[in-house]
Amino acid sequence: MTPISAPAEPAAIPLRTGGVAGSSAPEAWFRQYGVPFTRNVSTATLTPFLPDPAKATGAAVIVAPGGGFLMLSMEAEGWAVARALAARGIAAFVLKYRVKPTPAGMADFEQAVSAMFASAGRSDSRMRPDDAVAGLANPIADARAAFALVRSRATEWKVDPARVGMIGFSAGAMTTMVTTLAAPDARPAFIAPIYGSMEAVKVPANAPPMFAVLAADDPLFAHKGFGLIDAWQTAGRPVEFHLYEKGGHGFGLGKKGTTSPGWFSAFVSWLDANGFLKPTQ
């Protein structure tokens, strides 16, 4: 992890959802795996990535990066995904949601991250969305504000308010799921948890269609069953699930040398097949 200067975010819109209790260290950026991350986020923002009006479908996706609620993978699981969606005519909005406070020093932060992933990777570790709701009030509030903002500016952004969904990666997948479970006013039209927890949930009535992705060699969530998929099926709600042989965890748009890059095109095809990409008239 190498500290870097904060990049310019001229299009970022403050969501005005408040700060983070107990946070004293400022927001800090660093580079890991060759891409930028941020941590100690105490002010939530939403950054629009709008498609060429000639290609716009009217669909929109709120994009929630992952990072264990200690950091956010802004490029690989945020901006890059948003650019790819916009290129397909889908308006994308990267949600920089509030995360837990971390030590100001990089060495102490790295130690905290290592401990978190070691705990999450235990075979007996269970990250149940139903149980996580109470501890994720900030990300849920940020996601709710994001949905409200997109719908309030739908005409300006050429978005159909009824076709606003959410995609999230790892912790962002958890944010997507707890928002679906605990924030009925968000009303995501569809959800896409990408390499998130596969634990079963109590599926809400009229739960949105779900597109889920996981790698069979994911060190955090593989080999722990597919309760989430089973729960959606049992509830009679639409679900599509892609399990890739290899990809590990945190592969973003896909890991080279594996079939995991196929998930993005499959997701867009799924949106189309479910009627979410009907072009705006």
Regions found by a protein language model. Give the residues of each.
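C-terminal catalytic histidine-bearing segment of alpha/beta-hydrolase fold enzymes
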Residues: 110, 233, 238-281
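Hydrophobic alpha-helical packing residues
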Residues: 84-89, 228, 232, 271
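Alpha/beta-hydrolase
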Residues: 64, 194, 244-247
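Loop/turn elements at helix/coil->beta-strand transitions in domains of secreted/extracellular proteins
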Residues: 57-59, 88-91, 162-163, 187-190, ...
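Short beta-strand/loop motif that positions the catalytic acidic residue
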Residues: 212-214
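Primarily recognizes the serine-hydrolase "nucleophile elbow" in alpha/beta-hydrolase
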Residues: 135-207
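Acidic catalytic loop of the alpha/beta-hydrolase fold
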Residues: 217-222
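Serine-hydrolase catalytic machinery in alpha/beta-hydrolase-like enzymes
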Residues: 12, 19-45, 52-61, 66-157, ...
